[in-house]
């Protein structure tokens, strides 16, 4: 490190590669096209490139063990031996086959050891998956039970540290801290507290720390983002207990404790009292922490200042940051300061320079992972007194000014519409009880009506046609004809298997958010701006930079064509305003609530156009509602108020005869059920198959009045559930809700699955519903 620079650290970087090389390797391995050895070689290549890239950009504290073939929490479960018996691991080492069975489920084959403990001949399900704090990344939920034993079953952190060292990189290994790991998990015993396992877990971490120290590691990064949550005294005491034991029984290795995604709040004193050598704080989400740690922090504590936004794509105003940070760094002392992103850069794309199709002005406002590391290096130099970065500072300030004053940002007509929103636009004209009677008469559906969430498999043929159309190799007329053939085929097949409410399959859509945002003013789009959602699943979030306008109808003609092919109800499919917001990179110059209301007005226009075209069922997906929930309960009400308000603005312009559906996934509803009910959707479908219908307990306790489609088919796994398996889930749902409330559907859309998986699974689902109808009280048929 230059004497005219502060240390620059990253907490983690994107794993997928600049062009999604990890996705290609994983899917090739799962398809049997490459060997396990080749997969490991490809993964090593990505790690080596990441380390080299960081060093070349001026990062001086480089992480290792931030890479994962699927998920870092799953890696931790495997590392400590937290592997459910159903996956048949031997407790000493874990095969890649078992690892992926935990992640994806498994269809039993001759070589599938995990099937040895399967209660079904058809394989094992994947572990439950949920959102990582309030991000769009997913982790595999650890499973804990009373008396659980832990042991070091994977040396991955040591192996990757040694890999880096052999290449000449001195790294800081990254570990998920034991308290966060236990708090992220679940137990089937509701009375059991996973934190009670802490003393059994700590020795595994201590063994690992000794191994790392023996191999030359001087620092280790413990991620404890649970520190930004509402913690009780038991959790705070657990943190104190764990890190005191590390200090007492561990090696002389320095610990950088990383918190991120929010303020430490009432956990700050706990964090500052831990026997650690460094503390990372998120100064993007919690800028007030800077003054607090300057005033209250220990004089021997290295402070890692998370000053560059690791979760959004906007370029920083470096002169403004310099002005803000300089006095605080002077008080702390340069020897006690590291500069870092607010969190891991896992949540942003790799490199904006790969984008050749963005407007030059919009591109100049952006910073992806590579650019953020470069910004940190420049900021580190200027704060250390380097006078040779004046041009870089001027360019940064110029970009910030250009963005702030650009005519692309503000639209006067949008401002007029926003001021015109009144209470009549925020609610349905009639209560649900009356609407449901009208809709029941209109549709005449059987008990346990069957439907899907919207999308069908995006086959190679569909993707190739879309790509050919995008590059001009397929004309608009040819592409339109191709899509109509796909829709017609899907409609015929749905009728053949007996689904009650049909969908058109969404073959024209690249992504449920991108498809809509591409047809709304105020958005920009990337070609290589991918971020990891889970495993090989990558998403390319739109960039919402300005006021939102819908120039023309988006879905009406596709719905009209699909409905013309059948006499059964055809759901129109939309993505809701809250989900578009939460799955986009959003402008940071106005409140998110205001941005969301702009989106709600645009989608309200689409809903009304669909109804005018004849659509009787309109689904407005709010899959991402819960992930926008603030991490601190005290902030929940404000978010839920404006999020629900935006959904109702979007959905309430229709008549009583029109049935509004919504879909939510990866959600826990116990603590927000009142807000869900206030959205007043006629039908809500939710993901419940992995949780064995546990999520429905919230609806039962609340006496939720509207209709619900609990998912009976886990679409995140390739395995095909049997009819009896889905019947069991429906029976569980019937113990929690009235039969008249229940719909039968998969957990989520089927875009990422294959037809050979979808066809038998949906046929089994329809059979399950029909068998239950036949066996039920005739009055509900």
From Swiss-Prot:
Cited Pfam families: Meth_synt_1 (PF08267), Meth_synt_2 (PF01717)
Q: Where does L-homocysteine bind?
A: 453-455, 506, 621
Binding annotation for 5-methyltetrahydropteroyltri-L-glutamate:
20-23, 131, 537-538, 583, 627
Name the residues that bind L-methionine.
453-455, 506, 621
The cofactor required is:
Zn(2+)
GO BP = methionine biosynthetic process; methylation
EC class, as a word, reads transferase
Check the record and name the SUPFAM superfamilies matching this protein.
UROD/MetE-like
Reaction catalysis annotation: 5-methyltetrahydropteroyltri-L-glutamate + L-homocysteine = tetrahydropteroyltri-L-glutamate + L-methionine
On whether Zinc is a keyword of this UniProt record, the answer is yes
Q: Which GO terms describe its molecular function?
A: 5-methyltetrahydropteroyltriglutamate-homocysteine S-methyltransferase activity; zinc ion binding
* Classification via NCBIfam families: met_syn_B12ind, PRK05222.1
Q: Which family does it belong to?
A: Belongs to the vitamin-B12 independent methionine synthase family.
| Function statement | Catalyzes the transfer of a methyl group from 5-methyltetrahydrofolate to homocysteine resulting in methionine formation.
Q: What is this protein called?
A: 5-methyltetrahydropteroyltriglutamate--homocysteine methyltransferase
Q: Which organism is it from?
A: Bradyrhizobium diazoefficiens (strain JCM 10833 / BCRC 13528 / IAM 13628 / NBRC 14792 / USDA 110)
Q: What is the lineage of its organism?
A: Bacteria, Pseudomonadati, Pseudomonadota, Alphaproteobacteria, Hyphomicrobiales
């Amino acid at each position: 490190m230059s004497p005219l620079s502060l240390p620059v650290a990253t907490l983690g970087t994107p794993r997928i590669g600049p062009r999604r090389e990890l996705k290609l390797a994983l899917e090739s391995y799962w398809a049997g096209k490459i060997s396990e050895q080749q997969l490991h070689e490809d993964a090593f290549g990505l790690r080596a490139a990441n380390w080299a890239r960081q060093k070349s950009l001026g990062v001086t504290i480089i992480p290792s063990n931030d890479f994962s073939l699927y998920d870092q929490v799953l890696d931790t479960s495997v590392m400590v031996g937290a592997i459910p018996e159903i996956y048949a691991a031997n407790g000493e080492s874990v095969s890649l086959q078992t690892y992926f069975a935990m992640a994806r489920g498994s269809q039993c084959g001759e070589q599938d050891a995990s099937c040895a403990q399967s209660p079904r001949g058809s394989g094992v399900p994947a572990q439950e998956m949920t959102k990582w704090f309030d991000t769009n990344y997913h982790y595999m939920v650890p499973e804990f039970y009373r008396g659980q034993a832990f042991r070091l079953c994977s040396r991955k952190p040591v192996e990757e540290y040694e890999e880096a060292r052999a290449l000449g990189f001195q790294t800081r290994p990254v570990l998920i801290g034991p308290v966060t790991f236990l708090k992220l998990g679940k137990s089937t015993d509701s009375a059991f507290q996973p934190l009670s396992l802490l003393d059994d877990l700590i020795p595994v971490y201590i063994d690992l720390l000794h191994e790392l120290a023996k191999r030359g590691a001087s620092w280790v990064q413990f991620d404890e983002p649970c520190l930004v949550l509402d913690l009780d005294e038991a959790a705070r005491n657990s943190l104190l207990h764990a890190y005191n034991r590390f200090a007492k029984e561990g090696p002389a290795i320095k610990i950088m404790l990383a918190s991120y995604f929010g303020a430490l709040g009432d956990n700050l004193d706990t964090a500052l009292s831990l026997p650690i050598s460094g503390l990372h704080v998120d100064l993007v989400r919690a800028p007030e922490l800077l003054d607090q740690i300057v005033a209250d922090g220990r004089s021997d504590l290295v402070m890692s200042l998370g000053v560059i936004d690791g979760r959004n794509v906007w370029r920083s105003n470096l002169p403004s940051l310099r002005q803000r940070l300089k006095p605080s760094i002077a008080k702390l002392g340069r020897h006690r300061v590291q500069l870092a992103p607010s969190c891991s850069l896992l949540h942003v794309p790799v490199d904006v320079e790969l984008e050749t199709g963005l407007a030059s002005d919009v591109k100049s406002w952006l910073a992806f992972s590579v650019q953020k590391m470069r910004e940190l290096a420049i900021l580190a130099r200027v704060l250390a007194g380097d006078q040779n970065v004046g041009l870089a500072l001027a360019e940064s300030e110029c970009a910030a000014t250009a963005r702030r004053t650009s005519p692309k940002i503000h639209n006067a007509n949008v401002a007029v519409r926003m001021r015109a929103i009144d209470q009549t636009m925020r609610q349905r004209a009639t209560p649900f009880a009356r609407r449901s009677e009208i809709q029941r008469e209109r549709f005449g559906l059987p008990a346990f009506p069957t439907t899907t969430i919207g999308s069908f498999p995006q086959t190679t043929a569909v993707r190739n046609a879309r790509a050919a159309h995008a590059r001009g190799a397929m004309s608009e007329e040819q592409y339109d004809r191709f899509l109509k053939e796909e829709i017609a085929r899907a409609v015929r097949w749905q009728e053949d298997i007996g689904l009650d409410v049909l969908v058109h399959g969404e073959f024209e859509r690249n992504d449920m958010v991108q498809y809509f945002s591409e047809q709304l003013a105020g958005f920009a789009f990337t070609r290589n701006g991918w971020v990891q959602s889970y495993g090989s699943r990558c998403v390319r979030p739109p960039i919402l930079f300005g006021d939102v306008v819908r120039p023309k109808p988006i879905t009406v003609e596709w719905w009209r064509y699909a409905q013309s092919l059948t006499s059964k109800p055809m759901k129109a499919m939309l993505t809701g305003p809250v989900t578009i917001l939460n799955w986009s990179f959003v402008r940071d110059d106005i409140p998110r609530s205001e941005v969301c209301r702009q989106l709600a007005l645009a989608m309200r226009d689409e809903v009304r156009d669909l109804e005018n075209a004849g659509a009787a069922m309109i689904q407005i997906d709010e899959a991402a509602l819960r992930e926008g929930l603030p991490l601190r309960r005290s902030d929940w009400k404000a978010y839920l108020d404006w999020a629900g308000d935006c959904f109702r603005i979007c959905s309430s312009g229709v008549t009583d005869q029109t049935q509004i559906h919504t879909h939510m996934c990866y959600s826990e509803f116990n603590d927000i059920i009142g807000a869900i009910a206030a959205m007043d959707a006629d039908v809500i479908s939710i993901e419940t198959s992995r949780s064995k219908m546990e999520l429905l307990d919230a609806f039962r306790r609340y006496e939720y009045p509207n209709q619900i489609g609990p998912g009976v088919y886990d679409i995140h796994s390739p395995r095909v559930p049997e009819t009896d398996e889905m019947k069991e889930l429906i029976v569980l749902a019937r113990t929690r809700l009235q039969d008249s409330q229940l719909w039968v559907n998969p957990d989520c859309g089927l875009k990422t699955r294959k037809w050979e998986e979808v066809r038998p699974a949906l046929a089994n689902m329809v059979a399950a519903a029909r068998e239950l109808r036949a066996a039920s009280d005739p009055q509900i048929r």
